[in-house]
A protein has these predicted regions:
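N-terminal mature ectodomain segment of secretory-pathway/periplasmic proteins
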Residues: 1-58, 83-133
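Acidic/charged, solvent-exposed loop-and-adjacent secondary-structure segments enriched in E/D, K/R, S/T
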Residues: 53-73
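Generic structural signal for well-ordered beta-strand positions
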Residues: 60, 127-128, 140, 201
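A generic structural motif
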Residues: 65, 107, 133-134, 207, ...
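Short beta-strand micro-motifs in enzyme catalytic cores
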Residues: 100-104, 141, 214-218
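Acidic, serine/threonine-rich low-complexity disordered tracts
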Residues: 133-149
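Pro/Ala/Gly-rich low-complexity, hydrophilic intrinsically disordered segments
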Residues: 144, 156-177
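Short, solvent-exposed recognition patches
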Residues: 168-234
Length: 234
C-alpha cells in the first residue's frame, strides 16, 4: 500500500501525477490523478478500469486485464528475456528519496526494442524511477517518484474518484474476444513477420466511433515491450 507523487516526462512534455495504491485480498486497487491540465483520473477497480476525462465530459470504461501495478511491469528473468535483452545489476549503495535502491539496466540486443534503466527500492522492489532509452542510450521517457509514503492501510475514499461525472458520457470499450488470447480465425489477419521474441498476448474488440462494427485490437509483447495493432473492417 502506498500514496505518492511522480512525474512523467516524454520529450518536452511533463506531467505530475498522484497515485494511491492498495492491495486488498491479493488484488490491487488504484487511483491515478493528473495534477496538471485537465485533472483526469484513472481508477482501477476489481473488475474494470475507469478513465474520467473532465475536459471531454467522458468516462471510458474497459474490462480490467492483468494486474497493472508497478511491480507487474518489471522484467521477469527467463529464456525469452535473455535472448532479447542483457540484464545488468548495479552495486548496492545508491539512494533515492532517502531510500536504498538498486539500479538495473535492461539493454536490448537488437534494433527492435528500447532499453530500460530502473531504480528499484531495496526493501519493496518498487521502481522509484524508470527511464526508457533509444538505440543510442538517450532518454525518451522518464517516470520518477518525488514523494512516496508506504502505508499499512489505505482509506477506501482515497481509491474512489473525485470527479463529479454527472452528465458525462459513459463509453464502454475493450470487450474481450475470448478468455485466452488467440490469433484471428482462418482467413483473418495474421502478422506476416514479428520481431524475434514477440507473441500475441491479448485480443479484444474495440468500438469505432460512428461505426456499428468494432475494430480488432491485437497486442504483441516480448515480455517488456508491447505493440498494438488495430484492424478495422473495410
Amino acid at each position: 500500500n502506498y500514496d505518492g507523487l511522480f512525474t512523467h516526462s516524454t520529450g518536452r512534455q511533463a506531467e505530475t501525477m498522484r497515485i494511491v495504491h492498495q492491495v486488498d485480498n491479493g488484488r490491487s486497487l488504484e487511483r491515478l490523478v493528473s495534477l496538471d491540465g485537465s485533472g483526469r483520473e484513472i481508477v482501477r477497480t476489481r473488475e474494470e478500469v475507469h478513465a474520467y476525462l473532465p475536459d471531454r465530459r467522458v468516462v471510458i470504461v474497459e474490462p480490467r486485464g492483468d494486474d497493472g501495478s508497478l511491480l507487474k511491469s518489471l522484467p521477469t528473468p527467463g529464456p525469452a528475456l535473455d535472448r532479447n535483452y542483457q540484464l545488468a545489476v548495479g552495486p548496492k549503495g545508491s539512494r533515492l528519496l532517502g531510500r536504498e535502491v538498486r539500479v538495473i539496466d535492461v539493454r536490448p540486443k537488437d534494433i527492435y526494442r528500447y532499453g530500460y534503466r530502473l531504480w528499484l527500492d531495496e526493501e519493496t522492489a518498487m521502481p522509484l524511477q524508470s527511464v526508457v532509452t533509444n538505440g543510442v542510450g538517450d532518454p525518451i521517457e522518464v517516470i520518477r517518484f518525488t514523494q512516496l509514503q508506504l502505508k499499512d492501510t489505505i482509506p477506501a475514499h482515497d481509491i474512489e474518484p473525485t470527479v463529479d461525472a454527472t452528465g458525462f458520457q459513459w463509453i464502454r470499450t475493450g470487450r474481450k474476444l475470448a478468455a485466452m488470447p488467440q490469433l484471428p480465425s482462418k482467413g483473418g489477419w495474421r502478422p506476416g513477420r514479428l520481431p524475434p521474441g514477440f507473441r500475441l498476448v491479448a485480443s479484444r474488440l474495440q468500438p469505432i466511433p460512428g461505426s456499428p462494427m468494432p475494430a480488432q485490437h491485437l497486442i504483441f509483447s516480448d515480455g517488456i515491450a508491447a505493440i498494438s495493432v488495430f484492424i478495422e473492417p473495410g
